[in-house]
């Protein structure tokens, strides 16, 4: 690591500690030549994950967008914010572990619905009604019947 003060290449690490929930490492360094002390941050460079929308448009993956949708679906429901954050984190981790550069928005929606159905059925129905854009009451009733079948298994 080059010293920002004298440009010497030799530095030593005085202290290292994880930050940002373990996603980064903060290092305190000292130049071997001029003894200037400085801090560096090291983190894994994640490749951008692109979401392909229904109309073919592409946008960068946003975990906040998933979390906002979950919060809206769980409004006035007994679901802790921590649970919704965990769902969001699990979905992002699963998508990144697939090692693909692009993912369809439908895939993400299905992942959200699968997890939400295990947490709160009312929130699941709310999310599904917006996500699937039910055309009429019969389609909505069919979705409810499927949910009841799953619950009885």
From Swiss-Prot:
Superkingdom as given in the UniProt entry: Bacteria
PROSITE patterns with a match to the protein in the record: ATP_CONE (PS51161)
Biological processes per GO annotation: negative regulation of DNA-templated transcription
Lineage: Bacteria, Bacillati, Bacillota, Bacilli, Bacillales
Organism name: Geobacillus sp. (strain WCH70)
Family designation: Belongs to the NrdR family.
Protein name listed in UniProt: Transcriptional repressor NrdR
Cofactor entry: Zn(2+)
unnamed ZnF: 3-34
Binding note for cofactor: Binds 1 zinc ion.
The entry's keywords: ATP-binding, DNA-binding, Metal-binding, Nucleotide-binding, Repressor, Transcription, Transcription regulation, Zinc, Zinc-finger
InterPro entries, per the entry: ATP-cone_dom (IPR005144), NrdR-like_N (IPR055173), RNR_NrdR-like (IPR003796)
Domain ATP-cone, chain residue ranges per copy: 49-139
Function: Negatively regulates transcription of bacterial ribonucleotide reductase nrd genes and operons by binding to NrdR-boxes.
HAMAP family given in the database record: NrdR
A single MF term (Gene Ontology): zinc ion binding
């Amino acid at each position: 690591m080059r010293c920002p003060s004298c440009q010497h290449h030799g530095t030593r690490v005085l202290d290292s500690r994880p930050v940002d929930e373990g996603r980064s490492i903060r290092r305190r360094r000292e130049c071997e030549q001029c003894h200037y002390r400085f801090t560096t941050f090291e983190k894994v460079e994640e490749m951008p994950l692109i979401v392909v929308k229904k109309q073919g448009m592409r946008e960068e993956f946003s975990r906040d967008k998933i979390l906002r949708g979950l919060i809206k679906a769980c409004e006035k429901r007994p679901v802790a914010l921590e649970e919704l954050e965990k769902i969001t984190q699990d979905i992002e981790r699963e998508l990144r572990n697939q090692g693909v550069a692009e993912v369809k928005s439908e895939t993400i929606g299905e992942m959200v619905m699968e997890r939400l159905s295990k947490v709160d059925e009312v929130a699941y129905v709310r999310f599904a009604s917006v996500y699937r854009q039910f055309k009429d009451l019969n389609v909505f009733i069919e979705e409810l019947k499927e949910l009841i079948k799953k619950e009885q298994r």
